[in-house]
From Swiss-Prot:
One of its GO terms (biological process) is lysine biosynthetic process via diaminopimelate. InterPro entries: Aldolase_TIM, DapA, DapA-like, Schiff_base-form_aldolases_AS, Schiff_base-form_aldolases_CS. Its main location: cytoplasm. The active site is at 131 (proton donor/acceptor), 159 (schiff-base intermediate with substrate). Homotetramer; dimer of dimers. One of its GO terms (molecular function) is 2-dehydro-3-deoxy-phosphogluconate aldolase activity. GO terms for cellular component: cytoplasm. SUPFAM superfamilies: Aldolase. It catalyses: L-aspartate 4-semialdehyde + pyruvate = (2S,4S)-4-hydroxy-2,3,4,5-tetrahydrodipicolinate + H2O + H(+). The keyword Lyase applies. Keywords: Amino-acid biosynthesis, Cytoplasm, Diaminopimelate biosynthesis, Lyase, Lysine biosynthesis, Schiff base. This is 4-hydroxy-tetrahydrodipicolinate synthase.
Amino acid sequence: MFEGAMPALITPFTKDDRIDREGLQRNIAFVEEGGVSGIVPCGTTGESATLSAAEHEEVIDIAVECSKVPVIAGTGSNNTGEALQFTKHAADAGVDGVLLISPYYNKPNPAGLLAHFKKIAEAVDIPMILYNVPSRTGQDMPVDVIVELAKVENIVGIKEASGNAAKVSQILENTMDDDFVVLSGEDGLTLPIISMGGRGVISVAANIVPDKMSGMVNAALKGDYETARKLHFEIAPLIRALFLETNPIPVKKAAELVGLASGHLRLPLAPISDANQAKLANELRKLGVME
């Protein structure tokens, strides 16, 4: 179920700082038309850190109501009880799976990581994808912890955003017998990860160019690396531009520039600089998605 290109959705806000329900629905329809295989609301790209609990649930509810593709909801937290609460709501709402970031700031030891994820997995019977992103959490999940969690029946995969291809290879090597899916958490490393046995990407760029990201991933999964490489290099400059500043600052501006629903960023994130906006706009024009 969990393979292909799946955008980590931005969360559009209205001028009075509410969830832009209609805008979110339009954005979901746009990426679906672009061929994505799933959507991921309430991740880092969706500004989950500044959503209230009620808003978190609202975004997930909207996604489930209108999506025609599988929904993987971000339900992680550095508070195990809160992560469990979010996960229970997502399961009740009808999502197809959940994405659980490793606890940030706390920096739990390996025993704590195992206990955190196992507690949630035992309490809620839904497919769960781990999320390793040390640049955000301050901690890189050890391979042996990931391998042990892969043996838990409803922990079915990981979004790997460590930027370490050797580590990804080690995870794949040690989970091949566990029916465990490895997804890239970095757009620029998606193609090499698929070449090692990864099954797709949870993507920032797919918010803006879902057709090209889906085309690249699908070609690679079919073994058509000539087409996949061509698309990879075509969108690589945009991917770099989308990370000129902290995600999701550039992607929300890109969404605005191409006519998607976006709205403001919530503090403490501030708008993109004029210089970086110009660079971003230049890449959007090169791809023909902005006039």
